[in-house]
Regions:
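Alpha-helix-loop-beta-strand connector modules within alpha/beta enzyme cores
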Residues: 61-82, 99, 107-123, 153-175, ...
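Active-site beta-loop-alpha junctions enriched in small/polar residues
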Residues: 30-34, 53, 83, 100, ...
Length: 222
């Protein structure tokens, strides 16, 4: 059983990336536009990720520049998904990468630029692989089925999350995938420290109320 595996303690292949402001990142908004990014930051969210697809290079350049500016304006930790070169160019707070990006991204350049690095993990092996890179935070997913990505065979569930959290005590930890208001508190009760949401904000009838309710649910779990 993968959950019964002992964690090796001798990973020393990489120095640490710059740390986040806190071990508990709280409500983490993942958005696909700078309009939504600003709406979230206006409501007091302090950790967010810009995840955009299917844009031209010029559009990406402008979006990421704007996202970085918003992060500074609202004193928030804004991570750029995937586009690490543009994140470095515009002085982003951090970059979020998937496991598939680890072999192609210039991690040394990201670290030398002082950017934080968040890594996605889907299961025990990927968690250990991420640990090897000493990222600024680690994301565990998908906790529940989600419509934003095809996570067939990669649903972790609360049972695995509860096992993973204490193994990675030295990192800020983020749970992601299919989490809505009805699930946020029980996810936060695992001790994960941060709950990432996508549709729970952007598809809510009232995003202001949704953000407030999510923040209350996450805080009440601690």
């Amino acid at each position: 059983d993968e959950l019964d595996f002992d964690v090796p303690l001798d990973f020393n292949m990489a120095a640490d990336f710059a740390p986040c402001e806190s071990k508990s990142l709280g409500l983490y908004a993942v958005v696909d536009s700078t309009d939504w990014l600003e709406k979230c930051l206006q409501q007091g969210i302090k950790t967010a990720q810009l995840r955009v697809k299917n844009k031209t290079q010029d559009e990406l350049d402008e979006l990421i520049k704007h996202a970085v500016e918003l992060g500074k304006q609202y004193n928030a930790q804004v991570f750029i998904n995937d586009y690490w070169q543009l994140a470095i160019k515009h002085g982003a707070y951090g970059v979020h990468l998937g496991q598939e990006d680890l072999d192609i991204a210039n991690l040394a350049a990201i670290k030398d630029a002082g950017l934080r690095l968040g890594l996605s993990t889907h299961g025990f092996y990927e968690m250990l692989r991420a640990h090897n890179y000493r990222p600024s935070y680690m994301a565990f997913g998908a906790i529940y089925p989600t419509t934003t990505k095809d996570m067939t065979g990669q649903i972790q569930g609360l049972e695995k999350l509860i096992k993973f959290v204490p193994l990675m005590q030295s990192y800020p930890k983020v749970a992601i995938g299919g989490i809505d208001l009805s699930r946020a508190e029980q996810v936060a009760k695992t001790g994960v420290g941060s709950v990432a949401v996508v549709r729970a904000i952007t598809e809510a009838d009232n995003y202001v109320e949704a953000i407030s309710a999510l923040q209350v649910a996450i805080r009440s779990a601690h």
